[in-house]
Design a protein with these regions (language model features):
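Flexible helix-coil transition and linker loops at the boundaries of alpha-helical arrays
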Residues: 10-19, 52-64, 69-79, 115-124, ...
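C-terminal soluble interaction/assembly domains
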Residues: 264-364
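Start-of-helix signal in alpha-solenoid helical-repeat scaffolds, especially tetratricopeptide repeats
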Residues: 20-23, 78-85, 126-128
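Structural motif corresponding to the intra-repeat A-B loop/turn of tetratricopeptide repeats
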Residues: 35, 98, 139-142
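Helix-turn-helix repeat elements of alpha-solenoid scaffolds
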Residues: 1-10, 42-52, 57-68, 100-114, ...
Length: 364
């Protein structure tokens, strides 16, 4: 099915308007990873990621993305912070698979920044796996990853993260569940909200060579979507909605003021007051301009969604000798019991124990 999705989505990408291309590249990349089509995933992410950076840094699309006078769904899609972070997370997996942990680490660090509270300059990422893998890549490269590990553990809460094992040669990335969906709400449809559905799969377990490798949930994208820097997000769309309400209020008040001033055009003796006339004209002009500004503002939330993201992410590192190792993958419910119909056999193939083998596992 993922392979069919890749083909169908590729056709849609070919005909997609420029504003939607990154969205389709995200979707195809995720589906390609699950289908084992790693070259295709790499192509799509390498097409999407430079555009993300370009829009954030400076371009005509950047100015448009900040504009208050363009409908949100008319802008070039780059996604919410959790979506952009996931693009870098997936790209890092491919870098590590290609024997480039240094580039993988750069991706993790970029994802951390994207997922931080930049507006208040708190620089506090709450994506535990990004921090953990940042430190793990450092440890593999012979550097000190203890700071990143400490951040990851603080973010993971009750989940006790394993200490780094630089000698581990099998890196297991797992994902399960269905990620968040976007909806619009509010008076003007300006509030971006998320529909979330808790996945029956809360954790996973890979049994290989008689050893059970736990794959506990480290990060929940439902939580990541609704927060930034560990706090409830205040989207830029919220500011636009306030702007629309404020300009409406200014416009109404100004028009009322012009009517009052017009009523005072004549003094009690019947003579025309030039000052009142000028005030009435000025207030009426402000009122009309405010109304026009408010009408031109389009604060509707952008509900375009990278809809094939998972809900939960996990990671484990192990040591295995060279060879093909049959393994059993189970997805577990909240009580730790295997979910019926979710168990399958996978083959872990280690070609060279001196180099890292990257395994990517996804719930069907």
């Amino acid at each position: 099915v993922p392979g069919d999705y890749v083909s169908d989505a590729g056709a849609l990408l070919a005909s997609a308007p420029p504003k939607d291309r990154v969205l389709w590249e995200y979707r195809i990349a995720a589906a390609s990873l699950r289908a084992g089509r790693f070259d295709e995933a790499r192509i799509q992410l390498d097409a999407a990621i430079p555009l993300i950076g370009g829009i954030i840094a400076d371009s005509k699309d950047a100015a448009r993305a900040r504009s208050l006078f363009h409908p949100e769904n008319a802008k070039v899609f780059i996604g919410e912070p959790y979506e952009r972070s996931m693009a870098y997370y997936y790209r890092a997996i491919l870098y590590w698979r290609d024997g480039q942990p240094d580039n993988a680490r750069a991706c993790y660090r970029t994802g951390e920044v994207i997922n931080s509270d930049l507006e208040n300059k708190q620089w506090q990422n709450h994506f535990a796996l990004l921090d953990y893998l940042d430190g793990f890549a450092s440890a593999k490269l012979g550097a000190d990853g203890s700071g990143a590990y400490a951040r990851a553990q603080a973010e993971a809460g009750a989940v006790r993260l394993p200490p780094y094992d630089p000698g581990a040669n099998v890196l297991i990335f797992a994902e399960f569940g269905r990620g968040p969906r976007k909806i619009a709400s509010g008076r003007y449809g300006e509030r971006l909200m998320f529909q979330v559905q808790d996945s029956p799969a809360h954790d996973a377990r890979l049994t290989v060579e008689g050893r059970a490798v736990p794959l506990r949930c480290w990060d929940d994208l439902n939580y990541q979507a609704a927060t930034r820097g560990g706090r409830a997000m205040d989207y830029i769309l919220g500011n636009k909605a306030v702007f629309k309400s404020t300009t409406n209020a200014v416009g109404d008040a100004a028009l009322v003021g012009s009517a009052v001033a017009a009523g005072d055009l004549y003094r009690d003796n019947g003579e025309k007051s030039q000052g009142a006339e000028n005030t009435a004209i000025a207030l009426a002009t402000v009122g009309i301009l405010s109304k026009l500004t408010s009408a031109a503002t389009a604060p509707q939330a952008d509900t375009r969604t990278w809809e094939n993201l998972p809900q939960r992410l996990s990671f484990a590192a192990a040591r295995l000798p060279a060879g093909a190792h049959p393994a059993t993958l189970e997805f577990l419910d909240s009580s730790g019991r295997p979910l019926p119909g979710e168990t399958r056999t996978v083959l872990v193939r280690v070609d060279d124990p001196a180099h890292d083998t990257v395994i990517f596992l996804s719930e069907p």
